[in-house]
Amino acid sequence: MSREESVSGANDVSSLYPPPPPYIKYFTSENVEKLKEYNERREEGESAENELDFLIPPPMPSSGSYRAFGSVWQIKDHLPDLETMGITQLYKKTSEGEAEVTDYQYKIKELRRLSYSLLLNFVELVGVLSVNPELYESKVENIRTILVNIHHLLNEYRPHQSRESLIMLLEEQLEHKKQEVANIELVCQQVTEKLKQVQTLLKESQSQSQSQSQSQSQSQSQSQLQSDSQ
């Protein structure tokens, strides 16, 4: 393969919508049917390299990284230091910062300081452009370094932001469940009161019916006595 073809292939892999890999042509219905028998032969150690190997999922990465779409990705998400990337770090590390504040508070303080520095350098850049535009490079480089440091600090702050967002979500869910429980208790209380009212009405109706039956029986007995006396 020539150098031009190699560069072209690398560009294809790392493009926004990369084309299908070349081994996609081996994913046919016929090969899928042969795969089970081929796996059995592989377990027995009787098979050599075959195009059916492309149908077998790759093993888990044994190292701490893997390659996908022309880039190397770390299995464990780790944010590298700016110094390892060759960029000047404008803020102290947390262990070197103020001891009386927490980690995220220190990051907030440094973000504010870098934001002020960014505004100051922008004003200085405008002044340089108005006096001698040829001297802009150093100020632009300073602004770039400040922006990279701000972006790096924001990325370091994201774990705390995720925890706080999760806490807020759980608190909202807890408050919602408490409100639902309160609504259920209110409905149960209303149902209990209605049942008590129904029971009271039933008792009153039963007592009224009993009194009516007693009065009727008394009137009947009196009429019977009167008829007997006559």
Curated annotation (Swiss-Prot):
The lineage of its organism: Eukaryota, Fungi, Dikarya, Ascomycota, Saccharomycotina. The keyword Electron transport does not apply. It is found in: Nucleus. Pfam families: Med7. This is Mediator of RNA polymerase II transcription subunit 7. Its main location: nucleus. Component of the Mediator complex, a coactivator involved in the regulated transcription of nearly all RNA polymerase II-dependent genes. Mediator functions as a bridge to convey information from gene-specific regulatory proteins to the basal RNA polymerase II transcription machinery. Mediator is recruited to promoters by direct interactions with regulatory proteins and serves as a scaffold for the assembly of a functional preinitiation complex with RNA polymerase II and the general transcription factors. Keywords: Activator, Nucleus, Transcription, Transcription regulation. GO terms for cellular component: core mediator complex; mediator complex. One of its GO terms (biological process) is negative regulation of transcription by RNA polymerase II. One of its GO terms (molecular function) is transcription coactivator activity. The gene is MED7. Component of the Mediator complex. It comes from Candida glabrata (strain ATCC 2001 / BCRC 20586 / JCM 3761 / NBRC 0622 / NRRL Y-65 / CBS 138) (Yeast).
